[in-house]
């Protein structure tokens, strides 16, 4: 797999929520379920695929100096939170359906068990 850093390919909302959790000292463990709402093209089912890419993304979650500098330039993040992001790496547990089975809308494809600020980016 590649070593591409896709960390900033997230909604800005997720990062602002993380800053709110950071400021309030809220970083309890959570369980997030990953699922999809509708089959692509209104098909009757889907096939679970892409787990290697998801794991690669999670393993490479981090904020580079340029990422943090970009976020600083937005003028909405506090310096102590940006410092936290500069040392960010995911730690937690991932439970996922293996590649290949047929899956349906609202089936849980993956559970993310981690501190809320880490789970938020997965």
Residue ranges: model-predicted function:
Residues 1-122:
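Ordered alpha/beta subdomains of enzyme catalytic regions
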């Amino acid at each position: 797999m590649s070593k591409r850093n896709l960390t900033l390919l997230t909604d800005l909302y997720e990062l602002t929520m993380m800053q709110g959790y950071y400021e309030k000292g809220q970083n309890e463990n959570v369980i997030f379920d990953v699922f999809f709402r509708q089959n692509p093209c209104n098909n009757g089912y889907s096939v679970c695929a892409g787990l290697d890419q998801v794991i690669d993304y999670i393993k490479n979650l981090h904020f580079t100096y340029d990422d943090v500098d970009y976020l600083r330039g937005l003028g909405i993040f506090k310096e102590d939170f940006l410092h936290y992001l500069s040392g960010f790496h995911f730690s937690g547990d991932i439970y996922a359906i293996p590649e290949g089975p047929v899956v349906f809308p609202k089936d849980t494809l993956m559970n993310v068990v981690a501190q809320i600020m880490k789970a938020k980016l997965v």
